[in-house]
Amino acid sequence: MRRNLLLLLCLAGLLAVDAQTLSRSEVETYVINQYGKRWKDIALYFGEKDTLDKDNALTFEKTISVRGKSKNELFVDLNYWFLKTFSNASSSIEMADKELGVIMAKGYLPGIAYHSGGYSSYCVNIRPLVRCDIKDEQVKLTIVVPNYEVTKVDDGIWSAMLDEDFDKHPPYTVNETWSLNDCFPFAKKDGTKKTSSKALVMSHGYVEVLMNRIQMAL
């Protein structure tokens, strides 16, 4: 039962974003089709191209040209799409200003990476920040992955061996924030390389899929 606790916590997060049109399974399918499943190698590939900003966050930008559509038309289309997609307690629209031509939203994708072993198990979630700057015939997308939100459960094999009452009390669970500069491949000395590798690859996948979806909405 203890071994299933983290899986249940991850599942609860997945159910919480069921209303979103962008799910973890869709992102993972996209990532596997595009890059494969060698998480560490793919993370190293991205690490060679990625540069963390002054806040140790990853920032992605893309400019989409939409011929023949005015600023107001693009705003209406995007605002409608965001209302459908970011519509629950975990993901939401933070700002929608038609006059300024700005839409800002906060996304959420739980369970992008999971690892169990050693002393603890980990379930990694991301909460990307999305901004659209809208002009006539053009939308500039900016997506920021600020960190990894991690649920850590001390239920690993070593915890079981060292705790005589392992099965008699609930495991210790804590929510952590992992700074990207402390995670592989940005940090070479990372005790959770496998988890960090998949988290980075899935973050890239989320951004790519989200950008594609936004472009299709225009």
Can you annotate each of these PLM segments?
Residues M1-R24:
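Bacterial Sec-dependent N-terminal signal peptides
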Residues Q20-L218:
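Ser/Thr-rich, low-complexity intrinsically disordered terminal regions
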